[in-house]
Amino acid sequence: YSPVEGVEIYEVIRKRLFENLGDERIRKEVAQSYFDLYQKLGTDIPSEAKEIEYRERIEHSYPFHPELIDVLYERWGSFPTFQRTRGVLRLLAEIVADLYNRKIPSPLIQSSLVNLENQAIRREFIKHIGNEFESVIAADIAGKNAKAPKIDKDMGSEYATYGIATGIATSVFLYSFSGAARKETTLPRIRIALLREGIPSTIVGDAIGKLEEELWYFHSEKKQYAFRNQPNLNRVIVDKEETISDLRIKEKLYESIQSNCGKAFDVYLWPEIASDIPDNKSLKLVLLSPEYAYNPEESNKRASEFFEKAGTGFRVYKNTLFVLALESAQYLNLSKSLKRFLAILE
């Protein structure tokens, strides 16, 4: 037995998986449309994708994008357990069935369209790299609580239509494993894995930034991207945040206000009773405790009390008093920011 090499692998896959690929004219048109797209992208994609030979590779690999077959054959195929051609055929058969069942429209089957939420497909990858990567996929790439699909949903527009964040995360995952040394990918490669007609090329860099900010196992270094089973800084910070108590947040807020309030007013932070605020001609700024942010009625009641009373009597210099209270949404955002700040300091 001698392994299949080069363009020959595309022919083997075509014959094994499909009895009939339809009109050859369609195949050539699809190859030409991708080739035209790649000419427009210039240096944003690998140089070989702009060569005539690459258009021919697309024709040979149709309906798969050659990049998908290459990453499976060259990277995943380097695992002794993968069985190269057999492994590629097994995986692609599952991928085709999944796309057919989901009625996903695309001229070519690209890496970004591989559905890692499909358990049969997922198992084909996991069995070569270890069960610990189940949690990586579930946290970041595919599943009801995964972060990449949530980014697509929250961003809407092209993100939601084409599954941009999920597609990029999936493509990077496929590039992250190999029996050899290379275990990452680059932005130009990611564009090849994702872009097709209708997807703006500029969205890729923006989406990568969002993955870097929000995913837990997505690692980037010197414009190289990969998934690892070690958490990145985002996850470390989230773990630290869980140890930060509400009391500590409140104490930090008190300390920050106290050190930044200036001298234009006499400042009174979170007074409990009216007698905590003197009745004199000095300008006074009163900040109500954060607890009042969630109870506007009680907040108004307490502010009125401070205006009316001073100790056991009535307040004379009401016009020197200013009372501020946080709104609940403001305090919620402020608390989140302070929690993250304290977590980073640890």
Regions found by a protein language model. Give the residues of each.
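Extended alpha-helical scaffold and adjacent linker segments that couple domains
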Residues: 1-346
